[in-house]
Regions:
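ATP/NTP-dependent adenylation/nucleotidyl-transfer catalytic domains that generate, transfer
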Residues: 1-263
Length: 263
């Protein structure tokens, strides 16, 4: 597969209610610069039909509003893959899987999760490496702008053209969550020990109250979102930490977080 022409990579952009011009233009420009085949499938009309079918008010920007978009995108990708004899490459990463920050059977699902064991902090380093390595100045600029763009699923309407839904404002800094995840999975440390190490590591960057707040969020989400990790597509194990239910992390979906919260 590594020997195939880059035009065999089908990049699909599916603008909808939350898409900003910045991310749309970056996606299109990046796809063209790397030599991929770009397809645009606007999904707003299809999602509005779905809203009518299930009786959902489009002005109700609840989780249903968001997840309908994510699942419509997955349906489009799956069907394009069937049509082109291809496979859907997942965009989710290890950090999102740990927090369950994905729509069940939406972006949570693919035919191969290539980033399944790559944490968000490493994704950023990889993008920067690609930007520094390329001789194409236009591509370099796009990649650096991607790094400067707030992480967002863009499922809620923008505010004055800017991203309104910022992931790290909602679930916390990924550098903290990736830190928590590593020490929990790699060494099996309990929350109290992870907290002490995090306070020393991030001294001067985050105060103890902030670290405690997001560690608590991490623990609650890690346990409550296991059901999404119990049915993951295949993906490679890149580092020492992964959450595959087949070879790395097996945990009942109804596991209780109470003991951890007491710690």
């Amino acid at each position: 597969m590594l020997g195939r022409d880059k035009k065999d990579i089908i990049a699909v952009t599916m603008p909808c209610f939350g898409t900003t011009d910045r991310t749309y233009q970056n996606a299109c420009e990046m796809s063209k610069k790397v030599g991929a085949t770009l397809i645009e499938v606007p999904i707003a009309d299809a999602v509005n039909v779905h809203f009518r079918d299930i009786g959902h008010d489009p002005e109700d920007h609840s989780v249903t509003y968001e997840n309908c978009q994510a699942r419509e995108r997955t349906q489009v990708l799956m069907d394009i893959a069937n049509k082109t004899w291809g496979m859907v490459i997942g965009t989710g990463d290890l950090s999102e899987l740990a927090l369950g920050w994905a729509t069940y059977n939406g972006d949570h699902m693919s035919m191969y999760g290539v980033n399944a064991s790559v944490p968000k902090t490493l994704v950023r380093h990889l993008v920067k490496y690609a930007a520094d390595d390329t001789k194409d100045e236009a591509l370099k600029n796009v990649l650096y702008d991607v790094l400067d763009t707030p992480v967002s699923p863009e499922l809620l309407p923008p505010k004055d053209g800017d991203i309104a839904q910022k992931t790290e404002d909602l679930v916390g800094p990924y550098e903290l969550h990736d830190f928590f995840l590593y020490f929990m999975l790699r060494f099996g440390y309990e929350p109290s020990k992870i907290f002490r190490i995090a306070c020393m590591t991030f001294d001067g960057e985050y105060d103890k109250e902030t670290i405690f707040k997001w560690l608590e969020t991490f623990c609650r989400r890690f346990f409550s979102q296991q059901f999404k990790r119990s049915c993951l597509p295949d993906g490679p194990k890149v580092g020492t930490v992964a959450l595959s239910p087949r070879g790395d992390w097996r945990m009942p979906s109804d596991a209780c977080v109470a003991v951890w919260m007491k710690d």
